Amino acid sequence: MLKPDNLPVTFGKNDVEIIARETLYRGFFSLDLYRFRHRLFNGQMSHEVRREIFERGHAAVLLPFDPVRDEVVLIEQIRIAAYDTSETPWLLEMVAGMIEEGESVEDVARREAIEEAGLIVKRTKPVLSFLASPGGTSERSSIMVGEVDATTASGIHGLADENEDIRVHVVSREQAYQWVEEGKIDNAASVIALQWLQLHHQALKNEWA
């Protein structure tokens, strides 16, 4: 047993035995079957466990923030996965994109800001990263906040070859956070990013002054 340094958990990667990993489906996304054993809290090793894991890569998320005007830029687009559980499948979100091999989080954030919102990002600051739903997918999302001039944000954007149809919204920081509290913004990356901004906006303004 090798406990991870500085983490308040019991076990580490050395306490997992990967028996096999098989790709069941590969398309735009992939589905992998993991067969593994892991150490139990009683010190024994488990029986073989089988889990199907959705593999879609990792995402970069950008919170576009104008520290002078105290405004954020949100994008609106259809998300068909929200159809069954939300009042509408059109969601208000952060700028985001999948990280390709050789790209950094900042590379993707700056590229997607142009593609999805027509925004040029000035300074950036890492916020945090999180596992989207570790019970079923390996995806990790990394959030950055980016300094923008919100007066330049407007219009309809997106790549036609990716069937994107994206509308830009510029709202006050207070309004965006109110929508979080009211459940009108209910996707994880946007909720986390806007909650972080609500806690740190003054320090960020001082840093970027």
UniProtKB/Swiss-Prot annotation:
The UniProt record lists the keyword Magnesium: yes
GO cellular component terms, A-Z: cytosol
Required cofactor(s): Mg(2+)
Residues where Mg(2+) 2 binds: E112
Nudix hydrolase domain location: 55-193
Keyword Transferase: no
Cofactor binding: number and manner: Binds 3 Mg(2+) ions per subunit.
Ligand binding (substrate): F28, F29, R51, E52, R56, R79, M98, S133, P134, G135, E139
Regulation (activators, inhibitors): Inhibited by phosphorylated compounds such as AMP, ADP, ATP, 3-phosphoglyceric acid and PPi. Not inhibited by orthophosphate. Activity is high in cells grown in low glucose concentrations and decreases dramatically as glucose concentration increases.
Signal peptide limits: none
Keywords: Hydrolase, Magnesium, Manganese, Metal-binding
Pfam families: NUDIX (PF00293)
Positions of Mg(2+) 1 binding: A96, E116
InterPro entries noted in UniProt: NDP_pyrophosphatase, NUDIX_hydrolase-like_dom_sf, NUDIX_hydrolase_CS, NUDIX_hydrolase_dom
Biological processes, Gene Ontology terms: nucleoside phosphate metabolic process; response to heat; ribose phosphate metabolic process
Enzyme Commission no: 3.6.1.13
Active site: E162
Motif annotated as Nudix box, chain positions: 97-118
Binding-site residues, Mg(2+) 3: E112, E116, E164
Catalytic activity: ADP-D-ribose + H2O = D-ribose 5-phosphate + AMP + 2 H(+)
CDD domains: NUDIX_ADPRase
Family: Belongs to the Nudix hydrolase family. NudF subfamily.
Function comment: Acts on ADP-mannose and ADP-glucose as well as ADP-ribose. Prevents glycogen biosynthesis. The reaction catalyzed by this enzyme is a limiting step of the gluconeogenic process.
Subunit structure: Homodimer.
Record's protein name: ADP-ribose pyrophosphatase
Species annotation: Escherichia coli (strain K12)
Gene symbol of the encoding locus: nudF
